[in-house]
Amino acid sequence: MKLKSPKSLESRQSPRVEGKVWKVSEEDAGLILDKFLAAGERLGSRSKAAAARERGRVFVNGAEAGRDQIRAPLRVGDEIRVWEDRPGSARRRATPFTAGPLRILYEDQFLIVLDKPAGLLSVPLERRGEEESIFDQIVQHLRSHGKRKPLVVHRIDRDTSGVVLFAKDARTQAALKQQFRERSPERVYLAVVYGHPEPSSGTWRDHLVWDQKALIQKETHPNDPRAAEAISRYKVVETFESTSLVEVRLTTGKRNQIRIQARLRGHTLVGEARYVYGPELLRPVPFSRQALHAWRLGFVHPVEQTSMSFEAPLPEDLRDLLSDLRRP
């Protein structure tokens, strides 16, 4: 697969993505972005302007409006565009999933460690209806051995593949959850992102708040009483023409943490459908899900008190993606 460098926003408009465009006049020069958009002939209110910006639908001179542009005064001739149909904002159809045998990495009388395929929920959610989860599959597995239901310790996103851990009794569950609260487990992910993160290794530290209505993480001020600190350490493993393979180690484990932290730095995950902004033609690598894999999980066995570490091999779709990216 030969990757193309993104061209200018104007020259790569998609007929499926419509937007409104305004040029800043002398009369409006000096206004900040939200106030400009709040005018009645534009979006009509500051709240609508802020919402559009937070959803990544606002572009200034062809680039997404970032943190540094929120308070910067606009200049005569600046082009402001608001995308009305932001690619990825609509609910995406679930990745096709065909049930197969459980890929058990380890099992004893206290816990079970599995390699979860992409497209399968970790645990059932009421709003997902009858969609199958790996929890349901473990229930059937344990039932066939005359045992009780598994107990949730942690979870990974439906379209993220890799290592996930469940307990078999309440005491084991409590001990494992305590390790996660203390941030002691080793949680290592592999992700394919757009761009080349600089520096090539470092720490991502953000304050996030979960938007219950939109079902996404949003960046917020550290003083926000709702703020939750998110910390990840990253290292670029391999670079390609316009993408990179990155190893990410979680210190905290917030929902969608890697996906939003990568996006906040301009390195959206390949295949990302939720944390994506602007025209999809700026993301030229086709992939059916976010390119994220829970590669390694390490923890202390709560009963035997021995250190344990498990790795899930890259699934076929990610192996194929990397092969394509390495191709000249």
Feature-to-residue mapping (PLM):
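RNA pseudouridine synthases
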Residues: 1-214, 225-228, 311-325
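Short, P/G- and charge-enriched loop/turn segments at secondary-structure junctions
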Residues: 100-101, 217-224, 281-286
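Pseudouridine synthase
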Residues: 49, 131-138, 170, 181, ...
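Short Gly/Pro-enriched turn/cap motifs at secondary-structure boundaries
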Residues: 155, 222-226, 235, 286-289
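PP2C/PPM family metal-dependent serine/threonine protein phosphatase catalytic domain
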Residues: 225-230, 274-278
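Structural motif
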Residues: 75-78, 254, 306
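Conserved hydrophobic positions within beta-strands
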Residues: 104, 193, 233-236, 269
